[in-house]
Amino acid sequence: MSYNRFFSIFLFCIGITTLTTSCNDIEDSFTDEYPIKSSITQEGYQIVLATTDLAVGENRFAFIVLSEKGFINRDNSMVTFYAPIKLSHELKEPVQFMYWDDLTRGSFVTNVVFPYPGKWNFKVDLLDKKEDISIQGEFTVNEKTTAPDEGDRAPVAKNKTLDNVVSIQQLSTGDTIDPELYRYSIKEAIESGKPTVITFSSPAFCRDEACGPQVKVLQKLSTRRNSSINFIHVEIYDNPVELQNDFKSGLYSEPFKKWNLPSFQWTFIINCIGEISHRYQGFVSSEELDGALRFYLTERGTKNLCSAI
């Protein structure tokens, strides 16, 4: 089943206009917890928060805005963060709108430093149809992240590659599988002396509005930069062939479990000494990802960390 077809089915199942129901045959504990959705305003607007694994310190904060007609794509937005009530702390940050690669939708992205853990509130202000719109939501900031954080050593989990499967279909649920994304193990990539981009995703099973065609982004960037950077897709399911015929038969892959990922789509950049330099929960566009990768192709990046480029 192709990504587009599955995502269309998914949107039908959840009822994109009401966002209140889900498909029983793809439901599990993750779908109740991710993504975080705000209440729907009287005007019919809602925030879908893609980045829920937040901790004290600097974080990428990304969200989607929905209306009764679908995705809202607007520049010139502002988000205000309100700390737990007893701390009386406020942060105001401009938000950059990043179009997804299909150019029909996008994410609002900013970087923010949270000084305190606890329950935070936020307010998004934007202009839609010449009207000022304000949408409020809430989220939790933890002391530490659940998934590996920037600066952590990348977990060396044994992912499947072309060398240890009988059929390429065992590597991904996607309908188009690019062999270049399955040539190296995580261990081999880390030891190569090059930076590495790893995406954890199941292309045929995007479960929510924050999920997108991430593997296609990887293919696009791999074609452009694969001589200097390793690109790896790790399927989150261990048995993609069986899963195509039975939604309920899915078994999580060992790398997905070892990395302790609290939602279904993640992308990480690993520097040339095996440390995580960037992490992206939910979909990340090729524009945003490539912007981070350019550092490793500069003189500063190669001299400091990347002897093999």
What are these regions (language model features)?
Residues 208-225:
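Typically the conserved alpha-helix immediately C-terminal to a functionally engaged Cys/Sec
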Residues 1-10:
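Bacterial N-terminal signal peptides that target proteins for export
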Residues 26-117, 123-127, 131-172:
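Contiguous segments within soluble domain cores/interaction surfaces
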Residues 200, 226-245:
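Thiol-based oxidoreductase modules, predominantly thioredoxin-like and allied folds used
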Residues 236-264, 269-273, 295:
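Thioredoxin-like thiol-disulfide oxidoreductase module
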Residues 19-22:
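C-terminal motif of bacterial Sec signal peptides marking the signal peptidase cleavage site
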Residues 186-207:
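Short active-site neighborhood of thiol/selenol oxidoreductases, capturing the structured segment around
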Residues 145-150, 160-166, 272, 276-309:
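Thiol-/selenol-based redox modules, centered on thioredoxin-like
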